[in-house]
Amino acid sequence: TKVVTEILALLSPTINYTPSDIKKLPWLIYSNEEYLAELARNCIGMSKSEWDSFETSWDFIKHPLICTVRTVADAFTQWKTECDDRFAQLKANEEELNRVFIDIYGLQDELTPEVEDRDVTVRKADLQRDVKSLISYAVGCMFGRYSLDVDGLAYAGGEWDVSKYPTYPADKDNIIPICDDDYFEDDMTGRFIKWVETVYGSETLKENLKFIADALGGKGQPKEVIRKYFMDDFYADHCKIYQKRPIYWLFDSGKKGGFRALIYMHRYQPDTIARMRTDYVHEQQSRYRTAIEDLENRIAAAS
């Protein structure tokens, strides 16, 4: 509450609060403490519910945009309504707590109960952020970290169980190339499109890909916008979320982007790098050589 914030600022001007700082807070008796406790529990519950909607939560179950509707747009509309309702209720609760404690401590002339939107504990829906998190969840399904058939984490080490992935099979060799063209059938873009089709249906695939591409803010055909996001921005966004402990590892040939691939750290095997070299790097080099020869033949024929 505002009261606690003001008192803690006096007791400890830094941003760190110790148990001894909390112990120093003056506590005045209030006749209806259960009312305050219920409000506080309600606030905590809503905050946790919002936090659990993101994959960094230990209690994450599934992405909020995966539901019974057939378009990502409708799923986002439902999610936005849920977020707006939760935001409004939590803001009202926090303002009520402020009002009660301001009255208890007799601080009506110093503080007001109103809470600015930016200070409310939970967040509102954000189209680009939430679509990017949907893409991140899809990548998790590609690697088997998540499954469309299992709540929460499907695999984070231990014994691999292929039976957890009947609806959308996880990548077999834990190597997914990120390509600027359709060099491999199971590249990141191709697998993502298949994932969207599996989740939302083939009838709405084009509509969903366009909605996702528009949310990413790119220009051009939806497939190419999504491909460019995987090429240029996905891994940077992943590292922002997981900071210095990314769960997907990027193998990159250098600045020219000749070859890139992701693996899932928990599925790393002693032969992963060797397999990547023989099954993917050599294959892509061969495709590049073929493309170069084709261009040289065209130039020769035109001269």
Sequence positions of predicted segments:
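Glycine- and acidic
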Residues: 18-34, 78-88, 124, 193
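Basic, amphipathic alpha-helical recognition segments used for DNA target recognition
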Residues: 1-24, 31-46
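A glycine-rich phosphate-binding loop feature that marks nucleotide/adenosyl-phosphate handling sites
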Residues: 16-21, 55-67, 118-122, 156-160
